[in-house]
């Protein structure tokens, strides 16, 4: 990693910038957000389940190669840190070109887990998927101000 990221907020901003690059086909900044660790894990939205830094790098390069001319923008519903672990839960939204197709909107549900290693916040796990329909017939929608501290309400 080139710049040491010692604050969790800085790590989140670094991931935000890296996802914008990933959506345009450049996986390198996102790869740089990850811990070089054999216990780093990925449960990817397009199917890959990987363990170990080298396997993740290979997969992120494959994912980046599928994107062109877009950006992914994270929307954290929850961000929390305690001690040397932290996590975010939310979505990534964007209009992207995948596999040389037409620009199309994309939304992914994402959980990131961060670990502070030698004073630096690094990603250690990502679990992402395409949100399925709520089988109860409800949809997740913005509902600002309805309940203090809650941005979403299921209806």
Task: Enumerate the predicted regions with their spans.
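A beta-strand edge to alpha-helix "cap/lid" segment located at domain peripheries
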Residues: 2-35, 39-155
């Amino acid at each position: 990693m080139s710049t040491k990221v010692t604050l969790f907020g800085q790590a989140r901003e670094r991931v935000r910038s890296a996802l914008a690059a990933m959506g345009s086909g450049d996986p390198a900044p996102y790869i740089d957000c990850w811990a070089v660790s054999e216990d780093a894990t990925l449960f990817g939205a397009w199917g890959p389940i990987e363990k170990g830094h080298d396997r993740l790098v290979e997969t992120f390069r494959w994912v980046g190669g599928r994107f062109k001319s877009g950006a992914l923008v994270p929307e954290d519903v929850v961000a929390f840190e305690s001690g040397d672990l932290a996590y975010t839960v939310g979505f990534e939204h964007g209009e992207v070109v995948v596999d040389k197709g037409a620009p199309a909107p994309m939304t992914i549900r994402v959980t990131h887990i961060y670990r502070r290693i030698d004073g630096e916040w690094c990603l250690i796990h990502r679990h992402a998927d395409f949100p399925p329909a709520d089988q109860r017939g409800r949809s997740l929608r913005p509902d600002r101000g309805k309940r203090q501290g809650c941005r979403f309400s299921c209806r």
